[in-house]
Amino acid sequence: MFQEYLRCQVCFREVFKNEHLCDECKSSLPFVKKGHYCKHCGRVTKIAGEYCDVCKNNLTAIDVGRSVFSYEGNGSRLVTLYKFHGRRYLKKFFAEEMYKIYIEDGIRDYSPDLIVYVPMTKRAERKRGFNQGLWLAEEFSKLTRIPISHSIVKVKETPHQVGLNRKQRLENLEGAFHLKSKKEFFGKTVIIVDDVTTTGATAEMVAEKLKSAGVKRVILMTIASVGYIKKEGDM
């Protein structure tokens, strides 16, 4: 049976060998340049080796962060197809690109113990029909052989975050996450796998919850990140 992913997901040309993108579109993806990311959250930066405005001006529970590409152009298109249109098969491409970073940028050297993903409330997951973060975590776990923890749950519905600054998002997320078990996290190095870093508020709240359980180090790995632009009210 002819499968949908045998056509490039950007330009719809026919592709071969079960590829999701043609060579031309893959080369056009805005991959994060070596070193051009915030050392803490992995957000793309213009100057190599600098911190983003958020991490420069705030204490953060995230110790190390990396993103595959910038959330723009064909990068944002692919994430949108995956996140909002359920193109599940893209998880393999995303996980493979994250795995390259895991090996080449030395994330493996931190000897991570567990992978977690950003949970959704049961109601939100039923409405969407899937959790794209879980899909990604499962695929990344296969490649790294790091087990997934399902102990983080979201217990509070939160208002739509689009258009809100970091401070407003953090306020919305207060009390939204709960750990079913703290023992499994104590002294561990944990990777948070997520789709997009925008203000970083969601990952920060998850990281804080992990640190409260005694996690030694939190690593954030995302498909894409938004080059941060300060909004009124941000710190």
Outline where the language-model segments fall:
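Glycine-rich phosphate/pyrophosphate-handling loop used in enzymes and phosphotransfer proteins
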Residues: 1-193, 198-235
